[in-house]
C-alpha cells in the first residue's frame, strides 16, 4: 500500500505548489491546450492498435488517463499528491470509462514485474532534481513494462524559463534573471522568490541528456520531439489557437518538424519515446 504523500520524499515546496495550483485545469488554459493536444497526438501515433495495460506515473488529476481509458485502455494512475489522487478518482467516477488512481512514488511503483504495456512519465522526471532519483524512476518504468512495452517520458527544456521570461516580461525581475542563468548552466530550477509564476523546484533537460537517461534505463529510444514547438513565443497565441484553421495548420506543420533539433530546443516541453527490448 502506498504511503501518505509527505512520506514520498518529494521536496515540500513541490508538494505545496501542486496543492495550491489548479492542476486539473492547467491543460485547459493558456498554453495548456497546445501541450495537451500535442502530447496526445505524439502518444497516439506510437500506440499499438489494441487494448493496452497502461500505467500513468505522476498522472496528476487524470487528464491523460481519462482519454486513454475512453479509448479502451486499462489505466492505473499513480501520483504522490493526495489531492491529485482524490481529484482523479472523482473524475474517473464520473466517466463511462473509468480508471484507477492511487498514491505512489515513481521511484518505487507498487506493481510486480512486466505488468504493463505502456508507461507514461509525463511529469516525474522534472520534479526529481537528483540524477539517481530520475534513474530510479526510469528503471521502475522498465521493470513494470512487458518486453516490447513503450515508455513516454516528458521533460522541461533547459531553455523553458528563458522563453517564458521573454514572453511574460519576467526577465525585468533580476531575481528571475538569476533563476534563468542557473537553469541554463546546471539544469536545476530553484525559485527562492515565492512567486508562483516562476514555478517550483525542478530539473530541466537538454534533448541529449533526456535521451541518455532513458537509454541508460535499458530502453531503445527515438530522438526526442518537441511538444509545443515555438508557438508559445507568438504574441496573441491564445487568440491564434482559437482559430480552427490556424490551429490545424500549426499542428500539421509541427508534426512534420517535431524532431528537428532547433524546434525541440525551442519547445517548453520535450518528449522521448522508448521501447523495452524483448
Residue spans for each PLM region:
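A short glycine-rich, Lys/Arg-flanked "PGG" loop and its adjoining helix->strand segment in the class I
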Residues: 135-147
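Conserved class I S-adenosyl-L-methionine
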Residues: 2-50, 63, 67, 87, 150-183
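Acceptor-substrate binding/catalytic loop of class I
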Residues: 128, 194-208
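Class I SAM-dependent methyltransferase SAM/SAH-binding core
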Residues: 55, 62-108
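A short SAM/SAH-binding and catalytic strip from SAM-dependent methyltransferases
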Residues: 118-132
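C-terminal lobe and adjacent flexible extensions of AdoMet/dcAdoMet transferase-like proteins
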Residues: 213, 217-278
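A short acidic, Gly/Pro-enriched loop at the edge of an enzyme's catalytic core
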Residues: 107-119
Amino acid at each position: 500500500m502506498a504511503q501518505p504523500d509527505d512520506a514520498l520524499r518529494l521536496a515540500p515546496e513541490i508538494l505545496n505548489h501542486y496543492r495550491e495550483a489548479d492542476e486539473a485545469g492547467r491543460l485547459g488554459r493558456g498554453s495548456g491546450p497546445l501541450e495537451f493536444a500535442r502530447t496526445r497526438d505524439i502518444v497516439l501515433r506510437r500506440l499499438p492498435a489494441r487494448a493496452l495495460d497502461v500505467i500513468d506515473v505522476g498522472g496528476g488529476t487524470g487528464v491523460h488517463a481519462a482519454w486513454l481509458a475512453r479509448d479502451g485502455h486499462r489505466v492505473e494512475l499513480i501520483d504522490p499528491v493526495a489531492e491529485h489522487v482524490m481529484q482523479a478518482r472523482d473524475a474517473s467516477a464520473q466517466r463511462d470509462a473509468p480508471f484507477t488512481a492511487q498514491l505512489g512514488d515513481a521511484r518505487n511503483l507498487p506493481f510486480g514485474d512486466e505488468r504493463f504495456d505502456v508507461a507514461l512519465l509525463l511529469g516525474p522526471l522534472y520534479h526529481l532534481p537528483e540524477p539517481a532519483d530520475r534513474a530510479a524512476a526510469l528503471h521502475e518504468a522498465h521493470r513494470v513494462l512487458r518486453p516490447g512495452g513503450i515508455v513516454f517520458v516528458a521533460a522541461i527544456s533547459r531553455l523553458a524559463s528563458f522563453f517564458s521570461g521573454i514572453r511574460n516580461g519576467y526577465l525585468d525581475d533580476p531575481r528571475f534573471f538569476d533563476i534563468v542563468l542557473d537553469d541554463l548552466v546546471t539544469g536545476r530550477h530553484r525559485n527562492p522568490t515565492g512567486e508562483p509564476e516562476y514555478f517550483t523546484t525542478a530539473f530541466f533537460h537538454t534533448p541529449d541528456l533526456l535521451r541518455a537517461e532513458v537509454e541508460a534505463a535499458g530502453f531503445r529510444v527515438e530522438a526526442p520531439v518537441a511538444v509545443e514547438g515555438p508557438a508559445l513565443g507568438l504574441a496573441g497565441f491564445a487568440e491564434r489557437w482559437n482559430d480552427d484553421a490556424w490551429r490545424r495548420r500549426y499542428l500539421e506543420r509541427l508534426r512534420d518538424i517535431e524532431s528537428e533539433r532547433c524546434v525541440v530546443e525551442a519547445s517548453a516541453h520535450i518528449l522521448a519515446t522508448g521501447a523495452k527490448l524483448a
